A protein has these predicted regions:
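Glycine-rich ATP-binding loops of the HATPase_c
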Residues: 108-118
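Short beta-strand/loop element within the Bergerat-fold HATPase_c
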Residues: 50, 54-64
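Conserved short strand/loop->alpha-helix "switch" segment adjacent to the catalytic nucleotide/phosphoryl-transfer site
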Residues: 16-35
Length: 128
């Protein structure tokens, strides 16, 4: 997954991760890669220009579901519209956020996003 994202060693983002993915998943490999790839791409963009950028990724099984958590440093408070986080990109396209939401909906999963000063967290649970 990391080789298909914007994480480059020269930009200085500290990345901590732990991943233990079960062999049998209901989510397709394509959807899982799109989901994790977009989560990481968004985290990398949020870290741009920060003095101490970091990303933490955890993938495992929790309560008999696939649990994915991405925590990253951020300088911005992410905007919301009707309780949904929206993109901060020019043009407000937010294709990554839409793709993440579509994959979670497709598999009848759960997504939780939290934004506090200096940190953004996305947690996703998908049925196994």
């Amino acid at each position: 997954v990391f080789q298909h994202t914007n994480i480059k060693p020269d930009i200085g983002i500290r990345v901590d991760y732990k991943a233990a993915c079960p062999a049998n998943l209901t989510v397709s490999d394509i959807d899982l890669c799109a989901l994790i790839g977009n989560l990481i791409d968004n985290a990398v963009e949020a870290c741009e220009g920060l003095a101490d950028p970091y990303i933490r990724l955890y993938i495992g099984v929790l309560k008999n579901q696939l649990y994915i958590s991405v925590t990253n440093a951020t300088k911005d408070t992410v905007r919301k519209l009707d309780s949904e986080y929206i993109t901060t990109k020019r043009g407000n396209h937010g294709h990554g956020l839409k793709r993440i939401n579509l994959v979670v909906e497709k598999y009848e999963g759960y997504i939780n996003r939290q934004n506090e000063p200096g940190v953004f967290v996305t947690e996703i649970m998908l049925p196994l």
